[in-house]
């Protein structure tokens, strides 16, 4: 299939902003050193159905990720359109072609319309929605946000919040904890305040999210909302994904159109960033 957006490569000149990591603070014995640079690919809302446009686009994205210098690939949910067993098996097969470590949480398209009650997701991905991953001084805690029935709002289950607290309590000294949830931690969740209070109590200062398909920073009650864009893009936008570069105390958010160089969109301090705190909750 011809990809017109690749033809734009010769017409677009992009200037990248380079951010140097800050020197690490003095460490106590046994402390995990802060990340020098943790380079991640952040896929969310890829919405793959066998044979659809996103199926082809995601194959290209996987090839790009494999050829990149990324240390880790993160999936923020909505891997499929209907959450069917066939779709889940297909997209899992494509994800398994990645030659980088990766992990995923489910999105509403996996939980709301699941034909297996989410048991197929558990069988394929090894968990029912909660997953912890360590990389270069960072601890990523991912969890499901529902909904768990049609027409319902999103919600973080009480047992998942308890899991978050247990995992955070087991963090190594010096580890920075980052939350991952498909839904933004706002009014789309029925228990938003309980979630953000729990996260803040365990030291989470940034939360990755998808669902809205666009790169827009958000303020989740003082927690930095770090977005991921949808694979297909909105009308007039090139297909693409998000690159997140984690430094000792900040994260750089870059948009990566397929077949084109990445563009820096934001750089965010991982604690008390003024541009985050100035946003409405």
Placement of each model-derived feature along the sequence:
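Active-site-proximal beta-strand elements of phosphoester/diester hydrolases
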Residues: 37-50, 137-147, 178-181, 224-230, ...
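A short C-terminal boundary segment appended to hydrolase-like catalytic domains
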Residues: 27-29, 33-36, 245-281
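Bacterial N-terminal signal peptides
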Residues: 9-20
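Active-site glycine-centered loops adjacent to acidic/histidine catalytic or metal-binding residues
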Residues: 45, 77-78, 107-108, 182, ...
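Acidic-and-aromatic substrate-binding clefts and catalytic sites of carbohydrate-active enzymes
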Residues: 49-53, 79-86, 111-115, 185-189, ...
